[in-house]
A protein has these predicted regions:
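Aromatic-lined carbohydrate-recognition surfaces of secreted/lumenal glycan-active proteins
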Residues: 2-37, 50-61
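Extracellular carbohydrate recognition and processing domains
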Residues: 287-319
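Substrate-binding cleft of secreted/luminal carbohydrate-active enzymes
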Residues: 60, 78-225
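Beta-strand-rich modules
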Residues: 408-446
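Conserved aromatic anchor
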Residues: 367-383, 465
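Extracellular beta-strand ligand-recognition surfaces/modules
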Residues: 268, 307-343
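Extra-cytoplasmic beta-strand recognition segments
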Residues: 237, 249-278, 308-311, 343
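Short carbohydrate-recognition loop motifs
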Residues: 221-250
Length: 465
């Protein structure tokens, strides 16, 4: 009934049935699709009660064999059955998994994987960098390459070794600043606009599909996120190491399905890389074959952040299925480093509309120099997210980024040299094509000057070990 009703209101839903109840006899774990629970997956005409089946965690090869047989008997795909992996108790990629019970004679999965509590990764480290290292082990494996083999002394297969890649980079517009949703600073066009740590998950960008799929005729460059230097947001991609002479190497970054028109352009923000040639290359075949005509663009390398733009109109009518970087050098280069800050492929060169009706909906003063507030405004469909700034003297300073149009500001501040009883705020839309809009502005009314209150004394240092 719920599926029928959801379809009527144009909001269809899908159900995954957890292997905890039988059809007739109450609670019981079969650890697979079996004779007591198959009814939840049995077709009724062209309809199915449950779209997927999540098998309890104690499956074996024999139980998985039976799940495959039962799914086929029901006329369902065996991959509608998910073998549950209990990652919370096991400690993410430290979980012991009976992999042999999942593979066929060709080493392919016989069932889909049901990942219970994959966010357990967050408990394995203390910093953002720790998180990404553990995330890469979980999804890519200890070998650090989704195409590589699992090390013999390790139990964990990276998830990317077992499933085909999929991508959100589709259509005619794709842009990314590689934003992980957190950072030590916030950069705007290569300059620091917020010099403190932040965590705004809703501004996360599309991260590389493969981390890291590299080939090299010599030693591979070390690929990583760089939280010390970025073009926009909190981080860039960094490729660093020592280059031996006459080295060629590729870093395959994205699986895509991008349509190219006669108006499509490529924009790339980058820094460093001198001593080599760096190219952005496109695969225009589904099998990620590179080397097509007009599908290779050389970047102009400098020591500072710079932005290259290329016309891709010669590829009009084709699709881009993959994006990679290629590094070539003849002489050896020590302490080599290249940062990639932004990558955009789009046929939309229009700046997004500016937000409107910006107001301070609520505010609460802590003293004459610090307050908290909620701002509201009207956004637009072309925006990916919004940046909120405060003006202190002649300087605009970022307060936060968000995809919402009602935004909490935990700290609005002004310096001791500020004059007057009001302060200007602004909101800028960052478009889905990577371009910024004009700003919407409003005034934050402090109702007092900075001399009207004193600041609290800082807390005494805790010297107790």
């Amino acid at each position: 009934y719920t599926k029928e009703y959801a379809a009527q209101v144009n909001h269809p839903v899908k159900y995954s049935w957890y292997d905890a109840m039988t059809y007739e006899y109450g609670r019981y774990h079969e650890d697979g699709l079996g004779e007591y629970n198959y009814q939840f997956m049995e077709k009724e005409g062209d309809k199915v009660p449950a779209d997927h089946f999540f098998a309890n965690f104690n499956w074996t090869k024999e139980k998985n064999d039976y799940s495959v047989t039962m799914a086929q008997w029901l006329g369902r795909s065996q991959y509608d059955v998910f073998a549950g992996l209990e990652l919370q108790q096991g400690g993410s990629y430290k979980t012991k998994v009976k992999w042999d019970a999942l593979f066929d004679e060709n080493g392919k999965l016989r069932l889909s994987l049901g990942l219970f509590a994959p966010d357990t990764i967050t408990s394995l480290g203390k910093t953002g960098e720790d998180y990404h290292k553990n995330e890469n082990i979980f999804f890519t494996g200890y070998q650090g390459d989704p195409t590589g083999q699992k090390p013999e002394d390790k139990d964990w297969y990276g998830i990317a070794n077992l499933v085909a890649d999929r991508t959100p980079a589709v259509g005619r517009t794709f842009t990314t600043s590689f934003n992980t949703g957190h950072g030590k600073k916030w950069f705007v066009d290569g300059k620091v606009s917020k010099d403190s740590e932040w965590n705004y998950r809703s501004v996360s960008g599309i991260l590389p599909t493969w981390r890291w799929w590299q080939t090299s005729s010599g030693t591979k460059l070390q690929a990583d996120y760089d939280f010390e230097d970025a073009y926009n947001g909190g981080n860039s991609l960094k490729f660093a190491g020592n280059l031996a002479e006459n080295t060629n190497q590729d870093v395959r970054l994205y699986s895509t399905k991008l349509e190219v028109t006669d108006k499509t352009k490529l924009r790339v923000a980058h820094k460093g890389g001198k001593g080599s040639k760096v190219y952005v290359e496109f695969a225009t075949q589904k099998n990620y074959t590179y080397g097509g005509e007009n599908a290779r663009k050389e970047l102009t390398l400098t020591d500072d952040w710079t932005k290259d733009e290329f016309d891709l109109g010669e590829l009009a009518g084709q699709k881009i299925y993959g994006i990679k970087l290629t590094f070539e050098n003849t002489a050896a280069v020590g302490d080599y480093q290249f940062n990639l800050g932004e990558l955009t492929v789009t046929d939309n060169q229009e700046t997004p509309q500016a937000p409107t009706a910006l107001t301070v909906a609520k505010q609460s003063l802590k003293n004459a120099q610090e307050a908290e507030a909620i701002v509201q405004f009207t956004g637009n469909k072309d925006a990916d997210f919004y940046e909120v700034y405060e003006k202190d003297g002649d300087t605009w300073r970022l307060l936060t980024g968000s995809s919402a149009t009602t935004i909490y500001l935990p700290k609005v501040s002004r310096s001791a040299s500020a004059t007057g009883a009001s302060q200007e705020l602004k909101v800028v839309a960052v478009g889905k094509n990577g371009l910024r809009s004009e700003a919407a502005t409003t005034n934050f009314d402090w109702g007092m000057t900075v001399q009207d209150t004193s600041l609290p004394r800082p807390l005494a240092e805790n010297i107790v070990p």
